[in-house]
Amino acid sequence: MESDYNDIVAEYYDFEADSFERRAGENHVLKTLRNDFREFTLSRRPKKMLEIGYGPGLDMTWFADRNDIEIVHGVDISPEFQRIVENKARQRGDGKILPNLGSAEDIVEIVGESAVDTVYVYFGGLNTVNDLESVASAISKVLKPGGSAILTFVNRWYLFEIFWNILLLRPRRAFSRLRPVWNGYSPTRSLPSYCPTAREIGHKFGQFLNPVYRKGYCILHPAWYRKHWAPFNSVRSRSLYLMDRILQRTPLWNFGEYSLYIFESTDKE
């Protein structure tokens, strides 16, 4: 069953692989969020890193370009993404990026215990895992004592999406993330996923790691797939980002498109 699901996810991303990097570079909302994710990651002073769900290697190469980063391991379920990043690794020739093929559940076998000081997952790579609790345990094992995990998730409760689709008389789409299986963003291609709540994430990861920080994104600012509603650097975009920052201090922080969580490894006996 686990293998069948992993095959479905791998096939989905293999199809997307060739155009993934171009589309990511063209989307100003994705770029803004990615820059913020990276800044939070750098604030943890990483040296030996692991990315789960590395895609075309945008972040692996970005971190590897920094002199203070020693090595960036990666684990991704897509053979096409691995091929793309292996080509980038060969072109670099410095041995700093190591793309591996596998699932999030495989990371202990791939990189070993206490192998890295930082694990990061951007743009909801853990929304497509079989068992989030087992992944939380695996992340805690690969981290060195005092290491950090910077994790982002597609939110379960995205209030704007719910209200907008209700107004458009699309109740099925309005509540699609609340179902046991969410089919992803594409209206034509299904990616079976699960959107956990902040409480679920805190409970499952809190068994193995200490929570340090959390932040929500695109609470009022349009999500990446509605980037045209707030053009780059427009007054509307800047104003909505400001309002999102204000809402971070309220219970609405977790009702946007994405949330980021930082967890820290405890000392291991």
Labelled PLM ranges:
Residues 1-44, 58-62, 150-177:
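Conserved class I S-adenosyl-L-methionine
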Residues 58-106:
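Class I SAM-dependent methyltransferase SAM/SAH-binding core
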Residues 109-119:
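A short acidic, Gly/Pro-enriched loop at the edge of an enzyme's catalytic core
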Residues 118-131:
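A short SAM/SAH-binding and catalytic strip from SAM-dependent methyltransferases
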Residues 133-145:
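A short glycine-rich, Lys/Arg-flanked "PGG" loop and its adjoining helix->strand segment in the class I
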Residues 184-200:
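Acceptor-substrate binding/catalytic loop of class I
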Residues 199, 203, 213-269:
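A C-terminal cap/extension of S-adenosyl-L-methionine-dependent methyltransferases
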